[in-house]
From Swiss-Prot:
HAMAP family: KDO8P_synth. It comes from the Bacteria. Pfam families: DAHP_synth_1. One of its GO terms (molecular function) is 3-deoxy-8-phosphooctulonate synthase activity. It comes from Methylobacterium radiotolerans (strain ATCC 27329 / DSM 1819 / JCM 2831 / NBRC 15690 / NCIMB 10815 / 0-1). Its main location: cytoplasm. It is found in: Cytoplasm. This is 2-dehydro-3-deoxyphosphooctonate aldolase.
Length: 284
């Protein structure tokens, strides 16, 4: 199992297609939805970049960071404030949108304005949440918990598919390794694909370099290793890569230490696409 099998299901999200044997797809955007104009500007910049490189794009952002280290940390604008922004990004820019949900009752409302519901890593085994997300018919991206073995995702993904929704994506975002540290085991990528019957596998390159609680009242991160881990994962042959980005990461309200500066995204993605072509034996 040196790399992911070159066949399997395809999850269509707007114009983007996720499959382990197809060209790499990008999920990107700011960690937190900070406001309408901020989100639109980032989404427009990412759209232009993706179009220039010929890569599928799903815009991501979070309306609520419900698991912040400190109760006093900024959480976001909330679902009510986010829904019009999500809808505007879809309608004016033509981009599919992904956001995370934290409670079963959020799923149907979020699904009105987004294309992908994301299950946070800490909540990946919450059956009611998974079933509610599945019931919307939207694609469901499940982050593998930092506490799970990759083969445990078999049963997690099955909760969605057995509920009648085949549009499942599974994402690796690191495993807990001692205190305030995550490590990435690249073996997990083909293992997750195998145990989920070929579900598209995504590598979360920015949360994988997070240092949970590493700054006391907030999480730290090592963004200098984002490209290192992303290259390794894409070389395995994944369906997509997840990268949080911001115009000024050091001033972002959450996850700044592990986000990639927006200006650095084109060069990083161009490099990753070269690795993707090599992994999937395609020509430029």
């Amino acid at each position: 199992m040196s790399k992911i099998e070159t066949s399997g299901p395809v999850v269509q999200v707007g114009d983007a297609r996720f499959a382990n044997h197809l060209p790499l797809t990008l999920i990107a955007g700011p960690c937190q939805l900070e406001g309408r104009q901020h989100a639109l500007e980032i989404a427009a910049a990412l759209k232009e970049m993706a179009a220039g490189l010929g890569v599928g794009l799903v815009f991501k952002t979070s309306f609520d960071k419900a698991n912040r280290t400190s109760g006093s940390a900024a959480r976001g604008i909330g679902l009510d404030g986010a829904l019009p922004v999500f809808a505007e990004i879809r309608e004016t820019l033509g981009l599919p949108v992904l956001t995370d949900v934290h409670a079963a009752e959020q799923c149907a409302r979020a699904a009105e304005a987004v294309d992908v519901l994301q299950i946070p890593a800490f909540l990946c085994r919450q059956t009611d949440l998974l079933l509610a997300a599945a019931a919307t018919g939207r694609a469901v991206n499940i982050k593998k918990g930092q506490f799970l073995a990759p083969w445990d995702m078999k049963h997690v993904a099955a909760k969605v598919t057995e509920a009648g929704n085949p549009n499942v994506i599974v994402t690796e975002r690191g495993a807990s390794f001692g205190y305030n540290t995550l490590v990435s085991d690249m073996r997990s990528l083909p293992i997750m694909a195998q145990v989920t019957q070929g579900a598209p596998v995504v590598f979360d390159a920015t949360h994988s370099v997070q240092q949970p609680g590493g700054q006391g009242a907030s999480s730290g991160g090592q963004r200098e290793f984002v490209a290192v881990l992303a290259r390794a994962a894409v070389a395995v042959g994944v369906a997509g890569v997840f990268i949080e980005t911001h115009p000024d990461p050091d001033r972002a309200p959450s996850d700044g230490p592990n986000m990639v500066a927006l200006r650095d995204m084109p060069a990083l993605l161009e490099e990753l696409l070269a690795f993707d072509r090599l992994a999937k034996r395609r020509t430029a």
